């Protein structure tokens, strides 16, 4: 896109005909969104809350306050008392600097972006199926494909330029077949050859049913699957339960339509599948997205012209957030469970590997809110996003972000709803006012160049974080500045080094090459100097154990697989078919809440309207939110078009006008764009007043398209309404103005929290582990020998006692350093010992011996649980000695459990199956077994 400038102001834009993505076309937001750049409401100066009110301040005042607060939180709570929540609308260079601030400077995992709300599932599904993030397909596949499969993707409203390419095909010679999955009769669905309209939350059942028909009709590409895919039989076993009749009962989709869609998919010569929020923000999001991947893999239609998968993005630069490791991933799509990958990051940043936070995946935003609620995060830095409109269950979010003890920094271009409750507001530059790169969903990277100066004292986000890094004096392991960059191009060149050898390798890209008139797809290497159009054309996937970004997850429980579990699948460069059964949504409809809620977008607005709501053309095109209701439900409720109604869920209520039609019966739709910055009355109107804070177990993406609501008529009477949903945002702003006063660091006694100094509980846990180990030595020495009369066991007990004593010896320096609290631990361990070893008298009963071994296994599990918790905690302390001690102890306890389990297996068949005791003796009042039964 080219920017028109006159007298230092943006005056218009035009599409660039030479560009490979848009071919010169622009959608409504592209054509008219630029108007917000010149809007009078732009933030132009930093603001600090003084005496309850946000007042103008200098950059030095604002940044000094932020740094002072960061130091205060560090000293009282550790670095883990600070959280970052960013955007999908900044540039690659800015995300990379922020990733370094958080992961290399503060060494914390508390970093996420609003990409969690829109594309976390896209990334997760590709990691599960292909071994790494990275879209297989290309936008050019639209021009070649014989079949388009759009699942939960209203492309006509969300990717208008891409949709224009689809319309070109549909209206041209040899149009492709179009299958659309959407409970609404959207503008996209109206063009479909087959429109499948399942009930909200039933995507897995529907997609399993389609796979069942591919299997049963022999439409699987057996040759491709046998050579390039693993997991076929597990998938076949699961989908065999999803016959068309079963699927119709679950989803409401007629059997005839299932057969029709499956036949088109099964017999097409090429297939481009896409997905978006109808999948990602719904029940079983990652499981559903993986089933879409499965369909292309089963047909062998991937990595070929016209054949691929686009797990779409929801924001212009969401891909870059993921690439740089600024949210839930690591830089360059590296695997946090792979020590080699962590070493690579550490080497590039020139820090010790222990300083790269990798004890778990980065903290997702809902968990950060939980930590804010608990009081363990006291500083929250928000950039380029507006959580007081965009997060689910808004009343809960308001309560948390307005806590007096929480220090909130918001960095944005306008005074958003979130900025209005913040302690410090930093004015940021937007596109056209700064230089940087961004990547499209099909891996095409563009360079966006600065055209005008930002208004007032606004700064590029990158420059704000570079200033913070300098003031915090972040250093590498040689004592040099950790983040020494002075320009976006310097950051980009540093990023090229980080990308080297990874799926997104950009080493042959440069600003000069990207300024050539069109974007370039990654990977861009010496082998592919002009980029690579589509991935997996050689059927080589990113699934080698040493290379993959993730070892995958159980799609139903969300539990991550270990390296050994992953290796057992033996993907070795092959794609992985991931299976999952359908599970009911946690909140179903009821008599009180009979309608299924779904939220989404309108073509003329974007996210929370921070920019589009300030474009006259876009705002006039869609000025107010509505609730879309089916004809049948409107008739049952006696509703008419335009009538105001109150919509209630278990969490809140809104008041909206009704629009009738084009949605499945039993469902309602509300656009999520609208908050309160330009509200003209006191109605609640934000869709997220209603939504639930439940997230997908794998991707941790919120399920905005879930939950149940009811509609109540809103009858007008003289002087007001009989039923009214009042907004609560204004009240939240007033509470901050009254309650926070001037934002400044807490005093030495704890500031807002009074005189009570918080105490960490690491010492309690360590003391409990130490005392548990001490008692385990006693169990090996005194208790088990009285209960298990077996020479082999007796000889092994001395080895077990020695192993435990060695762990205690290794643990002592760590205990001494951190001052473990022993009293609590000994009490708990003694209670546990008495509970699991109720029989303490000497016995020759083999059953008692077996029970004693089981009890020993339980006690070892107690020890193991303490070590499991201390493993990431020791890493979060960046204490290499502590990490090594815990790792060694875990190995020792695993050896002991293996020994115990083997003896249980040896003794159990003979003890449990062969009768040796008379019934009257078994239940005799004097027997220890009777004591167990009575207890």
List where the protein language model places each region:
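N-terminal export/assembly segments and adjacent metallocofactor-ligating motifs
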Residues: 1-217, 246, 254, 336-339, ...
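N-terminal leader/propeptide and maturation segments of large enzyme subunits in energy/redox metabolism
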Residues: 52-53, 212, 219-255, 334-357, ...
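Extended redox/cofactor-interaction regions of prokaryotic respiratory oxidoreductases
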Residues: 96-167, 174-179, 204-208, 297-421, ...
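Carboxylate-rich helix-loop segments that flank metal/cofactor sites and access channels
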Residues: 121, 741-748, 813-855, 916-927
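Long, contiguous, secondary-structure-rich segments that constitute the structural scaffold
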Residues: 461-520, 608, 612-628, 632-742
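Alpha-helical bundle segments that constitute or directly flank the non-heme di-iron/ferroxidase center
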Residues: 754-789, 850-877
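Preference for long, well-ordered alpha-helical segments
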Residues: 776, 852-933
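Conserved alpha-helical segments that form or flank metal/cofactor-binding pockets of metalloenzymes
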Residues: 791-831, 900-903
């Amino acid at each position: 896109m080219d920017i028109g400038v006159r007298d230092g102001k943006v005056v218009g834009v035009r599409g660039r005909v030479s560009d490979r993505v848009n071919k010169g076309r622009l959608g409504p937001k592209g054509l008219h969104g630029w108007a917000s750049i010149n809007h009078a409401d732009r933030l132009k100066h930093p603001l600090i809350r003084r005496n309850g009110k946000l007042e103008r301040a200098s950059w030095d005042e604002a940044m000094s306050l932020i740094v002072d607060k960061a130091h205060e939180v560090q000293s009282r709570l550790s670095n883990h008392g600070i959280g970052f929540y960013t955007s999908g609308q900044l540039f690659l260079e800015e995300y990379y600097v922020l990733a370094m601030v958080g992961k290399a400077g503060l060494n914390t995992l508390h970093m996420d972006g609003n990409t969690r709300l829109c594309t976390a599932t896209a990334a997760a599904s590709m990691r599960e199926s292909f071994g790494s993030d990275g879209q297989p397909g290309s936008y050019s596949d639209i021009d070649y494909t014989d079949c388009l499969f759009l699942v939960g993707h209203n492309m006509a409203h969300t990717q208008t330029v891409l949709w224009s390419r689809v319309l070109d095909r549909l209206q041209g010679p040899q149009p492709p077949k179009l299958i659309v999955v959407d409970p609404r009769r959207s503008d996209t669905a109206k063009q479909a050859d087959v429109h499948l309209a399942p009930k909200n939350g039933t995507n897995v059942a529907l997609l399993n049913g389609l796979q069942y028909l591919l299997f049963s009709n022999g439409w699987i590409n057996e040759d491709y699957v046998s050579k390039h895919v693993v997991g076929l039989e597990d998938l076949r076993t699961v989908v065999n339960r999803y016959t068309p009749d079963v699927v119709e009962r679950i989803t409401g989709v007629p059997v005839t339509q299932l057969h029709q869609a499956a036949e088109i998919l099964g017999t097409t010569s090429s297939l481009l599948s896409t997905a978006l929020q109808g999948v990602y923000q719904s029940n079983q999001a990652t499981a559903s997205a993986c089933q879409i991947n499965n369909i292309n893999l089963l047909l062998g239609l991937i990595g070929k012209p016209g054949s691929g998968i686009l797990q779409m993005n929801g924001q212009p630069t969401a891909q870059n957030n993921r690439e740089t490791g600024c949210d839930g991933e690591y830089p360059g799509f590296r695997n946090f469970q792979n020590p080699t990958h962590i070493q690579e990051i550490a080497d590039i940043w020139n820090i010790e590997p222990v300083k790269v936070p990798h004890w778990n995946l980065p903290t997702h935003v809902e968990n950060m809110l939980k930590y804010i609620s608990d009081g363990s995060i006291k500083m929250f830095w928000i950039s380029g996003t507006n959580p007081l409109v965009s997060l689910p269950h808004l009343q809960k979010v308001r309560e948390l972000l307005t806590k007096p003890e929480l220090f909130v920094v918001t960095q944005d271009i306008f005074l958003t709803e979130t900025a209005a409750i913040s302690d410090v507001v930093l004015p940021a530059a937007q596109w056209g006012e700064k230089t940087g790169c961004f990547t499209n969903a099909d891996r095409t990277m563009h360079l966006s160049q600065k055209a005008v100066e930002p208004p007032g004292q606004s700064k590029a986000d990158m420059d704000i974080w570079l200033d913070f890094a300098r003031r915090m004096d972040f250093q590498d392991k040689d004592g040099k500045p950790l983040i020494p960059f002075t320009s976006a191009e310097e950051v980009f060149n540093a990023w090229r080094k980080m990308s080297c050898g990874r799926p997104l390798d950009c080493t042959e890209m440069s600003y000069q090459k990207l300024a050539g008139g069109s974007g370039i797809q990654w990977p861009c290497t010496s082998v592919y100097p002009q980029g690579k159009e589509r991935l997996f054309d050689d059927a080589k996937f990113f699934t080698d154990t040493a290379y993959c970004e993730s070892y995958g997850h159980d799609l139903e429980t969300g539990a991550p697989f270990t390296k050994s579990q992953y290796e057992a699948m033996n993907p070795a460069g092959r794609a992985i078919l991931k299976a999952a059964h359908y599970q009911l949504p946690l909140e179903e409809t009821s008599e009180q809440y009979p309608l299924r809620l779904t939220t989404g977008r309108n073509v003329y607005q974007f996210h929370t309207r921070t920019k589009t709501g300030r474009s006259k053309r876009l705002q006039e095109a869609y000025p107010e939110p509505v609730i879309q209701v089916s004809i049948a439900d409107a008739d049952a409720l006696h509703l008419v078009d335009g009538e105001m109604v109150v919509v209630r869920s278990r969490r809140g209520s809104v008041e909206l006008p009704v629009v009738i039609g084009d949605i499945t019966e039993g469902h309602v739709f509300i656009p999520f764009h609208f908050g309160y910055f330009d509200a003209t009355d006191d109605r609640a109107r934000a869709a997220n007043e209603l939504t639930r804070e439940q997230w997908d177990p794998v991707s941790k993406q919120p399920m905005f398209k879930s939950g149940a609501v009811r509609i109540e008529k809103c009858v007008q009477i003289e002087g007001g309404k009989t039923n009214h949903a009042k907004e609560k945002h204004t009240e939240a702003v007033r509470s901050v103005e009254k309650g926070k006063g001037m934002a400044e660091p807490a005093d030495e006694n704890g500031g807002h929290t009074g005189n009570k100094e918080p105490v960490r509980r690491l010492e309690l846990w360590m003391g409990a582990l130490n005392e548990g180990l001490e008692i385990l030595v006693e169990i090996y020495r005194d208790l088990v020998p009285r209960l298990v009369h077996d020479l082999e066991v007796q000889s092994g007990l001395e080895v077990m006692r020695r192993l435990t004593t060695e762990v205690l010896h290794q643990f002592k320096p760590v205990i001494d350093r951190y001052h473990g609290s022993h009293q609590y631990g000994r009490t708990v361990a003694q209670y546990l010992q008495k509970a699991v070893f109720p029989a303490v008298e000497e016995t020759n009963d083999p059953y008692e011996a077996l029970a004693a071994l089981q009890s020993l296994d339980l006690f070892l599990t107690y020890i193991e649980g303490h070590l499991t918790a201390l493993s990431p905690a020791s890493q979060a302390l960046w204490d290499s000695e502590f990490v090594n001690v815990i790792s060694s102890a875990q190995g020792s306890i695993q050896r002991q459990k293996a020994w115990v389990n083997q003896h249980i297996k040896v003794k159990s068949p003979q003890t449990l199956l062969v009768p040796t005791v008379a019934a009257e003796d078994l239940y005799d009042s004097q027997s220890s077994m009777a004591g167990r039964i009575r207890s």
